[in-house]
């Protein structure tokens, strides 16, 4: 998505349009900067793309949240003729299970942003990030693989992917799974968290897993995970990273009166994307 945004900005500038990009964070690049680890996509590669856009005349305004810092109405008053919303799917989903509010349970978005964009792993950084020794990452997508591989690089002695389906149903790319295994990541497939247990300080210390089996295919075409009655397992952890999907960022849509949204919170558009 962010790559497509760079291409669109470049093409608009090539056709002579004045393009201004409003970025909520303190660095340009979106998920390419905060979501993808340096070991998979070096920042210098992204910086080259951004510099190319700047050389073509694209303006970048950082630390500006449309819908909060500025409204869409204000942009229209400043004579912007077209507004393209590319705020992404930055709202992390959680499982809403008991104990999920315990300390040291983070979304993959927050964890990767702290490490990638805010340099939380550096001793000189003021941004806190938990350095777990026994880390559970919940989910089976590419972001889950990025999170668990990052945890290994930050010193996790045991790093696990916990996924409710089998490995064959994992949405992560085959090469990402391969790299994770090569780096010592464990895969607990057909397991699903049902509860977190915290210690006296409120920090997560265990996760209770429901063992699953595969049933009939669901709407996605993958076989549905079905709980095995009475089959649970409790494992010790000191950090959980939840990577079970994201939803569209609601800030921009909620700030525009009369905007129609789809079932999943996406902006409804016509054939010309308006």
Regions picked out by a protein language model, each given a short descriptive name:
Residues 21, 25-56, 60, 148-195:
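Rossmann-like dinucleotide-binding cores of NAD(P)H-dependent redox enzymes
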Residues 2-7:
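Short, small-residue-biased leader/transition segments that mark boundaries at the very start
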Residues 101-132, 217-274:
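FAD-site-proximal beta/loop scaffold in flavoenzymes
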Residues 63, 131-134, 190, 270:
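Phosphate-coordination loops involved in phosphoryl transfer and adenosine-cofactor binding
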Residues 8-14, 121-156:
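Rossmann-like NAD(P)H-binding beta-loop-alpha module
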Residues 62-78, 190-202, 213-215:
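A conserved short coil-to-beta-strand element within the FAD-binding core of flavoproteins
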Residues 1, 54, 62, 74-120, ...:
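Glycine/serine-rich phosphate-binding loop and adjoining beta1-alpha1 elements at the start
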Residues 80-88, 136-138, 238-245:
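Short hydrophobic core segments
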